[in-house]
């Protein structure tokens, strides 16, 4: 597909699951995308930046989305500490 300037553009850009690395298809209506804001540690205010995470419907259906998000956020330095014991 082309825009008004004649440049070729994609209509659909597939997302990748942050937890499993799977491609999230266009028809995966159970998939979610989360934007987690960057917060200044001293003032507690949002700095304007954010990190985006996508979780596929497959991970959500297994009930593993909370563990996966905690693992990813700990890896990226957003969360600190060990995973909570259930």
Swiss-Prot record:
Q: Does the keyword Ribosomal protein apply?
A: yes
The record's Pfam families line, in alphabetical order, gives: Ribosomal_S21e (PF01249)
Concerning InterPro entries, the annotation shows:
Ribosomal_eS21, Ribosomal_eS21_CS, Ribosomal_eS21_sf
Instruction: Name the species this protein comes from.
Output: Suberites domuncula
Name-wise, this protein is: Small ribosomal subunit protein eS21
Q: What GO cellular component term, any one, is given?
A: ribosome
Question: Ribonucleoprotein among the record's keywords?
Answer: yes
Report the record's Gene Ontology biological process terms: translation
**Can you say where in the cell this protein is located?**
Cytoplasm, Cytosol; Cytoplasm; Rough endoplasmic reticulum
How this chain assembles, per its entry, is:
Component of the 40S small ribosomal subunit.
The family classification in the record reads: Belongs to the eukaryotic ribosomal protein eS21 family.
Q: Which GO terms describe its molecular function?
A: structural constituent of ribosome
What is the superkingdom listed in this entry's lineage? Eukaryota
Keywords attached to this Swiss-Prot or TrEMBL record, sorted alphabetically, are: Cytoplasm, Endoplasmic reticulum, Ribonucleoprotein, Ribosomal protein
């Amino acid at each position: 597909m082309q825009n008004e300037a004649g440049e070729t553009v994609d209509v659909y850009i597939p997302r990748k699951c942050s937890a499993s690395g799977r491609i999230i298809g266009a028809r995966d209506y159970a998939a979610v995308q989360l934007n987690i804001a960057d917060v200044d540690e001293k003032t507690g205010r949002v700095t304007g930046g954010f990190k985006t995470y996508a979780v596929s419907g497959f991970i959500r259906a297994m009930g593993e989305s909370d563990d996966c998000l905690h693992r990813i956020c700990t890896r990226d330095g957003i969360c600190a500490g060990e995973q909570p014991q259930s």
